[in-house]
């Protein structure tokens, strides 16, 4: 029996999480445990909660929410409190919205997959791209098909993952009929419009809402951004080693010991 731990950053009631649960339950020889945040934690990246205690709340057999926790908390604590041995796979998602290019650095969905990798477990992040508030209309039917295609291949070692890397999978905003297939591509680069909106509460105290909208992406070589917009499911292996090897040698010359 293969053990899979799943979490997300949209919260324990999110449609994408429940679609993932339903899909994995249909696979033979798989046991699924869910530990998800009690509320939405989008854009919390790979943060851990170190300044207050965390509490499991059991919702059903194998289904827990973690009170006011991050996705990385969910993975970290599940591995230490619920498992006697490590699960075979950590899956984060299905996220409500894509995680493309530099989105990965903000993403709580990808942060949970990173935590799985740091704990020595193969990990996948699944995200559903959508446009113009079409997620309710679009649904997760194509995403469920893609999960069913990829997950068994990872569990059966048809797809091998190197240590300290995870798969970032983005599902296009299209139907099964118009699905173009799979594209293994690098993460792209996007230009963002950042802004902060100033407001005042009834007592006159100022506060801000942060905003972050993607304007366009850099054209050129195929990337996760270009291909998901063309109707492909994109698969990008993400390494946790963030060293810039291109700059190592030139920097060494600037800091040679006297």
Predicted regions and their residues:
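Glycine-rich phosphate/pyrophosphate-binding loops
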Residues: 117-139
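Electrostatically charged, flexible surface regions
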Residues: 138-258
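A cross-family phosphate/adenosyl-ligand binding-site feature
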Residues: 4, 18-81, 85-86
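Glycine/threonine-rich flexible loop motifs
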Residues: 98-107
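Alpha-helix C-terminal capping segments
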Residues: 78-84, 111-122
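Short glycine-rich anion-binding loops that position phosphate/pyrophosphate groups of nucleotides
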Residues: 10, 40, 70-71, 95-98, ...
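Short acidic, Gly/Ser-rich segments with clustered Asp/Glu that frequently serve as metal-coordination loops
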Residues: 10-18
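Short beta-strand segments
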Residues: 7, 35-37, 92-95, 126-127, ...
């Amino acid at each position: 029996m293969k053990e899979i731990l799943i979490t997300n950053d949209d919260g324990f009631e999110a449609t994408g999480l429940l679609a993932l649960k339903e899909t994995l339950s249909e696979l033979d020889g798989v046991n699924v445990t869910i530990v998800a945040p009690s509320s939405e934690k989008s854009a919390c990246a790979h943060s851990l909660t170190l300044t207050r205690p965390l509490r499991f709340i059991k919702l059903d057999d194998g289904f827990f929410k973690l009170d006011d926790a991050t996705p990385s908390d969910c993975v970290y604590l599940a591995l230490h409190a619920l498992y006697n041995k490590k699960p075979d796979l950590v899956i984060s998602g299905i996220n409500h919205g894509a995680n493309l290019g530099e989105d990965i650095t903000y993403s709580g969905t990808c942060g949970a997959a990173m935590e799985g990798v740091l704990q020595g477990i193969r990990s996948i992040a699944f995200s559903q791209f959508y446009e113009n508030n079409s997620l309710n209309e679009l649904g997760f039917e194509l995403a469920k098909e893609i999960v069913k295609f990829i997950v068994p291949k990872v569990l059966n070692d048809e797809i091998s993952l190197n240590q300290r890397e995870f798969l970032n999978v983005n599902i296009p905003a299209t139907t099964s009929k118009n699905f173009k297939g799979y594209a293994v591509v690098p993460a792209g680069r996007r230009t963002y419009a950042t802004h902060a909106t100033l407001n005042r509460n009834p007592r006159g105290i100022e506060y801000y809402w942060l905003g972050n909208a993607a304007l366009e992406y850099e054209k050129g070589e195929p990337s996760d951004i270009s291909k998901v917009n063309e109707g492909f499911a994109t698969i990008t292996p993400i390494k946790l080693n963030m060293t810039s090897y291109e700059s190592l040698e030139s920097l060494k010359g600037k800091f040679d010991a006297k």
